[in-house]
């Protein structure tokens, strides 16, 4: 005789003993589950399905409660594939939201949305865990002082400075140096600020995630020999994952970053690649839960979901989380609800230009398209602001003159315009910089340039004091003194060739 799988002995239900429910309905990644009266789980509680499928293979699926339907039924979204699940299977209510490991033991490791390591390096050596659903810091805890987050990268610090505890949008196509810029920022925050980084791969390609991991190992950001000395923790929810995982993986990464800020009192850099995929996953889940779609088919709760994530990324009196978010703009339409909602939260934008990358100028940050709310005299000071504005004016004038140069040549320009072009070309090259993480590829030692040194360098170029130096002297150097030294070396080399 076949026994009911939900009872352990006649007349006594294990559902009532263990506070477990039964699967009623499965539609893709969405499960409807019935619980005993009075034993309903709370919204966002984690539910676990542990069983065996028809091939006697172990099933272990974690779900998150999204809706209470009435009649003791809840609707949950699975965080992994629902293959092999059947009606009638037992579902255990954990009584708490999804919790993930936090702390120093997470550095150098790769996790999935559930906080399980997926790098084949064994379990994580930590007992500390945090729930992924947490409140944003209270107003009284926030640090209201506006301060610049120095990155040591000249073009960023001068023209589009980052705010400590701010949010930065990183716009760039494939092959313009986005990954290298991300790795350099991770490296510099570790060295200059004693901080750590968390990278959240939200709905990205598995190949790109793997490439990033390999490049981090190669450049030393992840230390294979001594994993505790690594500077970054990685959390991945790839494109092939169910929408529930892609929707929550950003929160998993953010939770790990919050521990470093609140408990270790550190400055943390949080990378989210790509924030659009977070919105996209939320849209899929919303449709699966039967909600009426809003504009352009997005979820009606788009602003709420984005706000609940972004409001947790902030500076407190203990430390800061500075977030750099790659933003995909669908069909290059900036009015699309997903990027438009993201822009409302950003303090700065860093735009990577294919034109600059093709000239070999790295980092290929576009000095005219990149913006920052921090570039104001009352925040950065008059000297910084005026230098940045003069640099932008010179580059803008050069851009306007390029058509004339292409048709008539440099000789047809006025003396003043020729001087502007010469200085703009020097500025363009001086905005390039050798990176620490690219040392293994270029052979040039990396350079960290402080903000004061950066301002001094550009002031000297704008004042005309360095008009006699060749353009090549400004290419891939750190501070302005290195450009002068390089000019002397170039002169000596040319004499030797003669």
Swiss-Prot record:
UniProt binding sites for ATP: 172-179
Any single biological process term in GO: proton motive force-driven mitochondrial ATP synthesis
Organism: Saccharum officinarum (Sugarcane)
EC numbers for this chain: 7.1.2.2
InterPro entries the record matches: AAA+_ATPase (IPR003593), ATP-synt_VA_C (IPR055190), ATP_synth_F1_bsu (IPR005722), ATPase_a/bsu_AS (IPR020003), ATPase_alpha/beta_chains (IPR050053), ATPase_F1/V1/A1_a/bsu_N (IPR004100), ATPase_F1/V1/A1_a/bsu_N_sf (IPR036121), ATPase_F1/V1/A1_a/bsu_nucl-bd (IPR000194)
Protein name: ATP synthase subunit beta, chloroplastic
Gene that encodes the chain: atpB
Role summary: Produces ATP from ADP in the presence of a proton gradient across the membrane. The catalytic sites are hosted primarily by the beta subunits.
Segments passing through the bilayer: none
Keywords, in A-Z order: ATP synthesis, ATP-binding, CF(1), Chloroplast, Hydrogen ion transport, Ion transport, Membrane, Nucleotide-binding, Plastid, Thylakoid, Translocase, Transport
Reactions mediated catalytically: ATP + H2O + 4 H(+)(in) = ADP + phosphate + 5 H(+)(out)
Domain of life: Eukaryota
Coiled coil (residue ranges): none
Molecular function (Gene Ontology), one example: ATP hydrolysis activity
GO cellular component labels: chloroplast thylakoid membrane; mitochondrion; proton-transporting ATP synthase complex
Subunit structure: F-type ATPases have 2 components, CF(1) - the catalytic core - and CF(0) - the membrane proton channel. CF(1) has five subunits: alpha(3), beta(3), gamma(1), delta(1), epsilon(1). CF(0) has four main subunits: a(1), b(1), b'(1) and c(9-12).
